[in-house]
């Protein structure tokens, strides 16, 4: 069995740590859907959508249901707005 080294950019690692600290990774991961969609699926769905950043920041703050099935995403009032914006920017860049 061979192992390969994985290089992760420091900013990407910092954003993943922020997602963990904010509680996002309870329901989401980068590669695979858990309760909510995978971050890479979110990035693919909104690629090229100029309004996605603002819309997703509002959705993460307020929560909601219906964009990815019927499992609701709770509001995230405990997460600072600047952190939500940073997370959405990171996710859309995947």
Curated annotation (Swiss-Prot):
Q: Which residues form the signal peptide?
A: 1-14
Q: Can you name this protein? A: Cytochrome c-551
Keyword Heme applies = yes
A family per Pfam: Cytochrom_C
Species of provenance: Allochromatium vinosum (strain ATCC 17899 / DSM 180 / NBRC 103801 / NCIMB 10441 / D)
Q: What does this protein do?
A: Efficiently couple electron transfer between the cytochrome bc1 complex and the photosynthetic reaction center.
- MF annotations from Gene Ontology: electron transfer activity; heme binding; iron ion binding
Share the record's PTM remark.
Answer: Binds 1 heme c group covalently per subunit.
* Residues the entry annotates as binding heme c: 24, 27-28, 73
InterPro entries recorded: Cyt_c-like_dom, Cyt_c-like_dom_sf, Cyt_c_ID
Q: Which keywords belong to this entry?
A: Electron transport, Heme, Iron, Metal-binding, Signal, Transport
């Amino acid at each position: 069995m061979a192992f390969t080294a994985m290089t992760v950019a420091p900013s990407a690692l910092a954003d993943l740590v922020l997602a963990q600290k904010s509680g996002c990774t309870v329901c989401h991961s980068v590669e695979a859907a858990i309760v909510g969609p995978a971050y890479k699926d979110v990035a693919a769905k909104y690629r090229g959508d100029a309004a996605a950043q603002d819309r997703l920041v509002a959705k993460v703050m307020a929560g909601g249901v219906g964009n990815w099935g019927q499992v609701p995403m709770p509001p995230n009032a405990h997460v600072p707005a600047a952190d939500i914006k940073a997370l959405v920017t990171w996710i859309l860049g995947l």
